Amino acid sequence: MSDNAAFKFGSFDYICEHAALVVCPMLGDQQGMAPTCYSRNVQLGSQIIFQPATCILHIAALVMATIMLLHVRSKYTAVGRKEIVLFFYMYIWVELFAIFLDSAIIPTANKVYPWFAAIYAGSVGALYWCLLLNGFVGFQFHEDGTPMSLWFLRISSLVVGAVCFGIPVATFKGTSSSMSPTNTVGLFITYLVFPCVCVLIYFISQMLLVVRTLDDRWVIGDLLFMAGFYIAGVLLLVTFSVTICDAVKHYVDGVFFSTLAFLFAVMMVYKYWDSITKEDLEFSVGSKQAVWDVKDPLLATGMEYYEDDAQSAYRGAGGSLVGGYNGNQYYGNQPGYAQSAYGQQGYGQYGAGGGYGQGHY
């Protein structure tokens, strides 16, 4: 790697000179590529931990991603719930790998490091592809949450991940003249260009979705913050990393701030999704109380209802729907039907003396 290398498409010379990327130790000559300034190391026993501040940030990202994942899973009827859950699972997977690779818990000289770095690169590609497809869920080209939607997302992400895994392996091993540690165009496209394209398409698709279908324009702010954090993370990583590292005396570098910016971008993705999805309370199993508003005037405040009003029609206090009499008025407040029904109404004038013989007949 030449000193003060200029940026060139397809080349990692400039980028690896400024930032400690996972793939840089496998590129270039026999010694790999290393940044001109990187954060201090910490020794824990016999283990040297590289990028300690960044590792702590990765752990914090795992905690935050878990919290967001649990919140997403609690919205049982939200649109695109299962699809965005897969995105957060993949983000957690990527962060787990980043802890072991950024910290050099898996040493760069170890024979398995190229394979883990390739798995990490493939997982990153699959993660951004999953984000891109989540951007089209809101357009309802096919129903979300169905086996077709989920399996298409899973299989396509697996295919993209396999491609983004195979290209680094071929590059690290130098399987051909077009893919070698010194010819990195394919890796440059899959590892750096492809994620940026996915974020751009996601941003444009969501802006169209908000403008065309939603009344709430406040969610545009979430998208703008997401894009801003992502762009800031890229710039901090590939442009200002050395400047930051020198300014803070090697305590942190651009990798730390770019990881933080990417975490904020993921949090904005969650915030945006949470803002545009509404839960159907009829099928919600949440623990919130008094979520229903009483609209029926019969149940409104001021209308008293007593359990005693539900008595039998023969002894109750309420009026009958027939003739305007209640049970006590109609049956003379007597305990039985046979004893009072004919004695209180028209038949009583004939039956009081014991039979029909004393009547008008």
From Swiss-Prot:
GO cellular component terms listed in the entry, alphabetical order: endoplasmic reticulum membrane
Assembly, per entry: Interacts with CHS3.
Transmembrane annotation, as ranges: 48-68, 86-106, 119-139, 150-170, 184-204, 218-238, 250-270
Localisation per UniProt entry: Endoplasmic reticulum membrane
Organism (species): Cryptococcus neoformans var. neoformans serotype D (strain JEC21 / ATCC MYA-565) (Filobasidiella neoformans)
Keyword presence, Endoplasmic reticulum: yes
Protein family membership: Belongs to the CHS7 family.
Function: Chaperone required for the export of the chitin synthase CHS3 from the endoplasmic reticulum.
InterPro entries (alphabetical): Chs7
BP terms from Gene Ontology: cell wall organization; chitin biosynthetic process; protein folding; protein transport
An annotated Gene Ontology molecular function: unfolded protein binding
Cited PANTHER family: CHITIN SYNTHASE EXPORT CHAPERONE
UniProt keywords, alphabetically: Cell wall biogenesis/degradation, Endoplasmic reticulum, Membrane, Protein transport, Transmembrane, Transmembrane helix, Transport
Membrane topology per record: Multi-pass membrane protein
Pfam families (alphabetical): Chs7
Tagged with keyword Repeat: no
This protein's name: Chitin synthase export chaperone
Lineage: Eukaryota, Fungi, Dikarya, Basidiomycota, Agaricomycotina
